[in-house]
Amino acid sequence: MNYDMSSYFEDPEFKEALAKYEGMVENHTPAYFEADELIDIAEYYTLKGRHKDADKAIDLTLQLHPENTDALVFRIRSLMLQNKKEEAKVVAQLIANSTDRECRFLQADMLMEEDRIEEAEEIFKQLVMDEEYEEDTLLDIIQDYTNANQEEYAGQWVDCLFAHSDMQTLPKTNQRLRDVLCDYYSTFNKPDLAIPYLNMTLNEYPYSIEHWNELGKCHLQQCQYEEANEALDFALAIDDENTDS
């Protein structure tokens, strides 16, 4: 489960933008959005498996902001997921600044698609040095390797994160760090290490169904049936139509 942004989607500001967008679509009325708002909406639809809706949000982004790098990168990733590699390369040529951070991640991802992991790793190493081991960069790399199911490389960057960050206090304040590490530990069958981060998140976002579901699954993996049932019951109490519980 990739729930890197799932807690952000609980934010009232995002919900307001989403409601405005969906009202525009339903009522066929024009509205203006910043590029970041529309890209977040596309990310939300992607997380929900609504890929056509995500593409429509990116279509509007590129209509309003035709040179926006993040929107172009999103479109390229969408084409890659559809195995339309040639079309993805054509869109990539529209990006003015290929040294942009997101473009470097895209280059690495395209190399990973071709099993050229060592070349992707070199891009990441240079990027991390350029950005002086910035936490968000390390988290992005961990998430990238987790998504690609590259446990060894993801683990090396988790070690790097722990070596360069205050991991005693940072998880208490950095929601994104908790989500990325949870995703890593859950993906690679280390549920006991994911559970503390899930509990921290649920203390802050007690109505996050995705995190209650994941907590239940982690307890199930450890045969902790009472705790699993309790977590899944919380998810059902929030939404009794929650099919993952």
Task: Write out the residue ranges for each language-model feature.
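Structural marker of alpha-solenoid helical repeat scaffolds
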Residues: 64, 94-99, 129-131, 164-170, ...
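Helix-start (N-cap) detector for alpha-helical repeat units in TPR-like alpha-solenoids
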Residues: 34-35, 69-70, 100-104, 134-136, ...
